Regions:
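Intrinsically disordered, low-complexity proline/glycine-rich segments
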Residues: 2-295
Length: 295
């Protein structure tokens, strides 16, 4: 091969390599996710993540009294009763931490009990909040005559829309539960999803379906005695930061799922017997206000 031919061959190889790199970059372009993380998290057409519920004293080690005080000073979303209990891993690195308002759930009276999750990034900046909406949940539970039907609101830091995740009342005993929600896309159109618990599962496995009933993701759960781990995957054409956030918070919710159902069942009974007068938190009440009201 002549020197000129060798140079041409070298340029061709470089062009092919650049094209391949560009193609890989396009395939791993996930809205709201850095290219570096996406490149490592995308495999076989799916975006992968892990939600790991801590079963060691890592919580106290990393978020003891001193660091709690420092974190509260850094973010007003990190309240004094915030208990960090899970981490989110994407592309092999920790990208998020999930906590809940411990006092609101563990210590509050029945009518004041609220389940509030918060998702932070690695540096403890707020990314999202998931709230159990007592008003909507009680309304649905009353309508279903005692079948616990929970509604959760998900508010993310970069979205103008709130996502409402609801448990379906269309459930027979011993059959899988379903949850539904929708996300507004970049063109202002809703994209609907359903999360269905697998009929045969040992650790809280769920499958994600799109509005056409196609399987587009899965949550593979491994529940331990005092913790758990969920390995999630979503088809890359559906994956964006908002959907990933909903699924990550939903995974963390699973260790509270049974308690949440029992709470709504108990509240429904107490309200029906006149033992409790329902009350809504001011922040939740704001979500029900008429957006066209005179201010």
């Amino acid at each position: 091969m002549t020197a000129a031919a060798a140079r041409v061959s070298s340029r061709v190889d470089a062009a092919v390599s650049d094209a391949a790199n560009d193609a890989r970059g396009e395939l791993t372009k996930i809205p709201g996710v850095s290219k570096a993380v996406a490149a490592k998290a995308v495999r076989n057409g799916y975006y992968h993540f892990i939600v790991d519920i801590w079963i060691t004293d890592l919580n106290f080690t990393e978020f003891g009294v001193y660091k709690r005080t420092r974190n509260r000073a850094k973010s007003r979303q990190f309240t004094s009763d915030m208990d960090i209990f899970a981490e989110v891993i994407e592309g092999g690195e920790r990208t998020g931490l999930i906590g809940y308002r411990e006092d609101l759930w563990e210590k509050a009276e029945s009518k004041d009990k609220r389940l509030v999750f918060k998702l932070f990034n690695e540096s403890l900046n707020w990314r999202a909040t998931m709230d159990l909406m007592i008003g909507r949940s009680l309304q649905q539970t009353i309508a279903s005559r005692g079948m616990p039907v929970m509604t959760y609101s998900v508010n993310t830091d970069e979205d103008n829309f709130i996502v409402y995740l609801e448990r379906s009342a269309n459930k027979w005993p011993l059959l899988p539960e379903n949850f539904g929600f929708f996300i507004m896309d970049g063109e202002g159109k809703p994209q609907f999803y359903r999360i269905k618990r697998d009929l045969i599962n040992l650790g809280g496995d769920y499958t994600l379906y799109d509005q056409q009933g196609k399987n587009v993701g899965h949550l593979d759960g491994k529940v331990f005695s005092i913790g758990g781990k969920w390995k999630g995957k979503v088809r890359v054409e559906h994956a964006d930061r908002r959907l990933l956030t909903v699924l990550q918070l939903f995974s963390a919710l699973q260790i509270f799922n049974a308690d949440s159902r029992r709470h709504m069942k108990r509240l429904w009974k107490d309200v029906g017997r006149g033992k409790v007068k329902p009350a809504l938190d001011a922040q939740e009440a704001d979500l029900y206000k008429n957006p066209r009201r005179v201010r």
